[in-house]
Amino acid sequence: MSRIGNKVIVLPAGVEITNNDNVVTVKGPKGELTREFSKDIEIRVEGTEVTLHRPNDSKEMKTIHGTTRALLNNMVIGVSEGFKKELEMRGVGYRAQLQGKKLVLAVGKSHPDEVEAPEGITFELPNPTTIVISGISKEAVGQTAAYVRSLRAPEPYKGKGIRYVGEFVRRKEGKTGK
């Protein structure tokens, strides 16, 4: 029994769902998201509740059931509240700037790294060492944040690099001299 798949998705005020042959469109105050789901899972919209039903209890159907429900729930949360990830930069001279929709990072390389904001993603800089990535698609926000972090992932000796706010970086001790 898929526990997540059996949970009912309750639609907040101002959110509409349309299901056209398992191509689901979710509209809300922050925008609109569309995604195609497996034809094996039946998606029923009844007023302000969405339920998902699977044809049988095979292992594959249970996994698709839970995944579909989680993706659909994330779409509903995205168009009503949105998602955001915060990154912090640690290191001497590490800073970020915004040039239009482009994020320019100085992270100890001979050249600045430039990151173009994908469609539906916005960058904010509360201060030069903090980056806030926000949007309505959880997948796009997470992927963009992971890409920015990968430009200079935190290293274990001094802890320099780009990390998620609250991320714990395990520190190592350096070599000891003779």
From Swiss-Prot:
Swiss-Prot/TrEMBL GO biological process terms: cytoplasmic translation
Which UniProt keywords are present, listed alphabetically? Answer: Ribonucleoprotein, Ribosomal protein, RNA-binding, rRNA-binding
Name listed for the protein in its UniProt record? Large ribosomal subunit protein uL6
Q: Which GO terms describe its molecular function?
A: rRNA binding; structural constituent of ribosome
Q: Would you identify the family this protein belongs to, as annotated?
A: Belongs to the universal ribosomal protein uL6 family.
Q: Which GO terms describe its cellular component?
A: cytosolic large ribosomal subunit
Could you tell me the superkingdom of the organism this chain comes from?
Bacteria
Q: What's the short name of a Pfam family annotated to this entry? A: Ribosomal_L6
Q: How does it assemble?
A: Part of the 50S ribosomal subunit.
Organism per entry: Streptococcus gordonii (strain Challis / ATCC 35105 / BCRC 15272 / CH1 / DL1 / V288)
Q: Which HAMAP family match?
A: Ribosomal_uL6_B (MF_01365_B)
What the protein does? This protein binds to the 23S rRNA, and is important in its secondary structure. It is located near the subunit interface in the base of the L7/L12 stalk, and near the tRNA binding site of the peptidyltransferase center.
Matching InterPro entries, A to Z?
Ribosomal_uL6-like, Ribosomal_uL6-like_a/b-dom_sf, Ribosomal_uL6_a/b-dom, Ribosomal_uL6_bac-type, Ribosomal_uL6_CS
